[in-house]
Amino acid sequence: MDRTNTRSEGNRQVGIVASYDFTRREELGRWFPPDVEWTMTFTEEVPYRDNLELVSRLGRASLLTRPVRELVGRGAEAVAYLCTACTFVDGVAGERALREAMTAYGVRRALTTSGAAIDALRAVGARRVAVVHPYQEPVDQLLGRYLKDSGFDVVALTALGLDSVEDAYSVAEQQVVDAVVAGDHARADAVFVSCTALPTYDALPRLEARLGKPVVSANQATAWALLGAVGERARGAGQRLLEHRPTLGA
């Protein structure tokens, strides 16, 4: 268990379960206001041979039992499972099942990164979406299917071209910027940057100004939705999503 900020009486409390390999904690914290207590815990490590096996194993509800109950025991009013592919790998029904399991473990408001991304894209008025991601096949196609089944027209699906899933952990912000600019599409209402391993906080305002449309990232959407679930707002100057309220908000 990792307590990320100091508890003060009366503060809203939220919790995050991150996949064991999550490395962007410091960046994620930039979206949280100082008067919200947020606590992060991690899943157990899982063995895997490829991208699909990794996210499939991390997408099992049983993996969330211990960390979710720990967060609930510490007073979390809402909990998010912070992992994109882990929460879309089994489709819309699988994402819903994860939230239902989290609720069964005692969470009052349960969210996932993939579910938050859908809410975020709808909030900015997107119907046609360009997607940038670090995945290998067939995980990329599962992402496209998840978005389509959620009501979006995926007009472009652009990979970062990484050789392995581990390479996502060392992607630099400029690589993300270059990939989003290259992966945008004239017909897209918004761009979605999938994967919580990618750095996006400082890139989002630059990209939105350059492209003239909303750019939503996985970590941004998760923080936005989780904070909205307890009636709070995420911080981030020049990020269009943050002008809107989540539909799951309190």
What are these regions (language model features)?
Residues 1-66, 132, 137-172:
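N-terminal glycine-rich anion-binding loop in soluble enzyme alpha/beta folds
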Residues 17, 77-82, 130-131, 188-195:
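Periplasmic-binding protein-like
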